[in-house]
Amino acid sequence: MSLRRCIAFIVCVVCAASFNACQEQSWESAMAAGQAAVQQGNYVEAERIYLAAVKKAEEFGREDPRVAVSLSHLAQVYAGQGKHVEAEPVYLQALKIYQAVHGENHPDVAATLNNLGVLHRMYGQYEQAEPLLTRALAIKEKLLGPHHVDVALGLANLAQLKVSQGQPEKAEPLYRRALAIREESLGPSHPEVAKTLEHLANVLRKLGRQDEALTLDLQAREIRAKRS
């Protein structure tokens, strides 16, 4: 290779790297702006920003992980606005990319399955929700172990589905596992512990165990009182 060609090649490589860095910065800025809009409760603006972020991410390739990240955030914004019809295919598109990039057993796959399951549960589509939430929980347990705080979230979501299905007896052991994990991982005075106690109390009331439910409600109130 001649000196001139060598210099030209180096210049091309440097320019490409600079261009990619600018693309990356542009995408990251869009994602940050979208998150800020969500935190402000401006879902219409967040939707617009995340749609633009998807297009920016696609410049890296249609199956680039950044596309899946952008799609996941967009789907969450759709869901936050009650746009189930719009959210589901976007989640599915993100899931397809995550599975292609990472395989079946990956935290991003589990998170997307979980979000899809919660979406279906919210709209009363319990038969579709259950296998998604069950699969998400299984992946988390395999990757993180049975006592990780993210496993508690999966257990709680599955328990909530069982309550919605009119099966409080199946929800109780799931909530108890979630409670034990959260108490151990987050401490006995954490707000998530209080929330789990309240959900478990609700289940016990449905099972006719009023005294036990009252005890848990009082524990939850004590936690919230200490933090107020």
Please describe what each predicted stretch is.
Residues E28-G41, P65-G80, Y91, P107-M122, ...:
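Conserved alpha-helical positions within TPR/SEL1-like repeat arrays
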Residues Q23-E24:
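Bacterial signal peptide processing site
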Residues A8-S18:
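Bacterial N-terminal signal peptides
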Residues R176, E198, N202-K226:
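TPR/TPR-like (Sel1-like) alpha-helical repeat modules
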Residues E59-R62, A100-E104, K142-P146, E184-P188, ...:
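Short coil/turn linkers that connect adjacent helices within long alpha-helical scaffolds
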